[in-house]
Amino acid sequence: MLEKNNTGLIIIDVQGKLAHSVHENEALIANCTTLVKGALALDLPIVWAEQIPQKLGATVPQINSLLPDHQPIDKFTFSACDEPRFLDAIKSAGVDSFLICGIEAHICVYQTAAMLKGMGFNVEVVTDCVSSRTPENKALAINKLNRLGVQSTGLEMCFYELVKDSRSNSFKPILNLIK
């Protein structure tokens, strides 16, 4: 079970042209935006990466505008874990579990999640917050991640798991995001 005080969010490459070229891109952007809003409402640490932003563009404005106190970590490698600044941010987050969202599921999300799992972190891929250019590649990534021990979750599922109790102060803000 996810615990609010031991879970962070990783955002991978929800950027420019790439974000608009993936399967069901509007739903992906909307769901990732909701996930970021929820992470902020729950006060989860957020680690945010961008793949070669000079070429692929910045993170979509719907997400970028929510994170004025965060800076994206530029990367050239497909796994964000190969970037020292990303690893520093992961360690600084002070948590053992991470939700991961972004694109593309079968490349950067897959490689980052697999490496984090290999480092001993609990990683859960938020399946309605990841995509690839084809649904087959997304399914392949999720299947392979599951076989590596990375769990699958969904936007609502992870929120309710983190909130745990309808009497919690965080329940109402989360409920407002998903209803």
List PLM regions with ranges.
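Active-site-adjacent betaalpha module
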Residues: 1-5, 42, 55-179
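A short alpha/beta connector and helix-capping loop motif
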Residues: 4-7, 23-48
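N-terminal nucleotide-binding beta1-loop-alpha1 segment
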Residues: 7-14
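A cross-domain feature marking catalytic cores of carbohydrate-active enzymes
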Residues: 14, 48-51, 127
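Short acidic, Gly/Ser-rich segments with clustered Asp/Glu that frequently serve as metal-coordination loops
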Residues: 16-20
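Short, solvent-exposed loop/turn segments at secondary-structure boundaries
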Residues: 21-25, 135-137
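Short coil/turn segments at secondary-structure boundaries
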Residues: 23, 50-51, 74-77
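A short linear-motif detector with a strong N-terminal bias
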Residues: 25-26, 51-53, 130-131
